[in-house]
Regions:
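Hydrophobic transmembrane alpha-helical segments in integral membrane proteins
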Residues: 1-18
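Juxtamembrane "helix-exit" motif on the non-cytosolic side of transmembrane helices
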Residues: 22-27, 58-65, 118
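Membrane-interface helix-boundary motifs at transmembrane edges
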Residues: 25-41, 96-101
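Short juxtamembrane and helix-loop transition motifs at transmembrane-helix boundaries
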Residues: 38-42, 62-73
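Core segments of alpha-helical transmembrane spans in multipass integral membrane proteins
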Residues: 43-59, 74-91
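Membrane-helix boundary/interface segments in integral membrane proteins
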Residues: 66, 86-98
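Loop-to-transmembrane helix junctions at the membrane interface
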Residues: 68-72, 98-107
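Hydrophobic alpha-helical membrane segments
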Residues: 82-86, 105-118
């Protein structure tokens, strides 16, 4: 199930973007598509999945550690709190449509998740 959650989140992003674009009043253009994509990416893959990751690391540390091959340690609390911050920032970014805020969120998320993937 864990494998499918990110894939389903991105499928939901595409579907919600298409639905919102179809319901938007004219004129509709590429700028609207970009804003809608950013909104739903902030909400689902960044926001809700960040909160989900925080829940796993903070509330179920033993199961999370076993699932990713770690030993249970205080580092999980650090990762869980980082996920909590990213998740909250993502949910805020979905509804606070400031370009600078969303850019900062993208840079921070890319740095954290890119570093975690290396």
């Amino acid at each position: 199930m864990v494998f499918w959650v990110p894939i389903l989140a991105y499928v939901a992003v595409v579907l919600l973007t298409a639905l919102s674009f179809a319901r938007a009043a004219p004129p509709r253009g590429p700028a609207l598509v970009a804003r809608l994509l950013l909104r739903y990416i902030c909400l689902l893959p960044v926001g809700l999945m960040g909160l989900w990751g925080a829940l796993g690391h903070l509330v179920f540390p033993a199961q999370s550690a076993a699932a990713i091959g770690w030993t249970t340690s205080p580092f999980q609390t650090e990762v869980g709190l980082s996920n909590l911050g990213i998740g909250l920032a993502g949910v805020i970014g979905a509804f606070y449509a400031d370009r600078g805020y969303r850019l900062a969120l993208a840079v921070m998320t890319a740095g954290f998740l890119g570093g975690a993937g290396i």
